[in-house]
Amino acid sequence: MSELEFVTKHRRHLHQHPELSLHEFETTKYITQFLEELGVSYERPLETGAIAYLNGNSDHTIAFRADIDALPIFEENDVDYRSQTDNVMHACGHDGHTTALMLFVKRCKEMFDKGTLPHNVVFIFQPAEETGGGANRLIKAGAFNNYPIEAVFGIHVNPFADEGQVVIRDEEITASATEYRFFLKGLSSHVADKEQGHSCGEALLHVLNQVGQIQQYHLNGLKRNIVHMGHFEAGEAINTVASHGYLEGTIRTYDPNDLNVVKTQMHKIAESVSLLFNVDCEVKFEEGYPPTMNSPKLRASVEQAINAANLEVIDKPLPFLFGEDFSFYGQQLAPAYFAFVGTRNEDKGFVTGLHTSHLNFDEKVLIYVANYYEQLLMHYGEE
């Protein structure tokens, strides 16, 4: 079986059988069966996912990570390998990440059998990237306590970069993701007796207006930030004063100071709305993933590997504004570096973005990823 046949077979199987975060049971079974057939030892620190290891009898241990979960999206691709699970789809390319790491494991096992594996390698098949913080769960579970990992590498498909390109950036490459929720409680009344009620409808309109101005008036316009209002509602009937109101959204920033500014302004909004409209207004925050920070000291190894794999380095001037739980590896485990491999191919129609119902790509890019990983492994530690 050629490598293209290998990645096509495994990626399309995974694509047909997507599973949501923390429910990747069949995906895990598929991966571990592959590892067993290959003769590679692994551990299962969590209910789903797996950590595999090959000992190269080296002083250096490096890790490579792939996320394995899917999204609650109905697939609209008209292909024979479309999702067989209703309203679940690999719309973020994790089927590709998993397959590329499987190919890399296969290559490393061949080197191991020949006695030419240059370093000790940890392969992370991580669950729950989309929701659940699988990276953090693995770290907290002690999954890596027995491995003196010096560096962690990961990659993500990117439909906005062309095939053969690898997008990199030192320091921040993805943003933090923090969810916020406003809860409003007033007093209902008939619309004919409106003065007897405390309307959360008007109060919520004020909240929406004020939250919408945070980004414009309180954050540096030269930085990339998002204060997004995703869902809001108030009231239950057309002829009653709304007794409850609700707003939820997300904050994306790569500067902790900017995040604090947003939180402070939202608390002020809640306080002012309570006073102005005589309702109870409270805002709560749910911390998501911190910014992904790429270690500058790994930059030389990354750039050398990209070039050695005959791929093109694309420097990104500003971070992406989506969240990524790969950030926990760099924050808690070891210096880390996260890159993006281009999958855009206009001739084949592979142009739609991540988290869309038409995401697709040519499996040959997964070989590019394995090539990049192999070059990182071969040249890691060189000056």
From Swiss-Prot:
Pfam families: M20_dimer, Peptidase_M20. Its EC number is 3.-.-.-. It comes from the Bacteria. Gene3D superfamilies: 3.30.70.360, Zn peptidases. InterPro entries: Amidohydrolase, Bact_exopeptidase_dim_dom, Peptidase_M20, Peptidase_M20_dimer. NCBIfam families: amidohydrolases. This is Uncharacterized hydrolase SH1513.
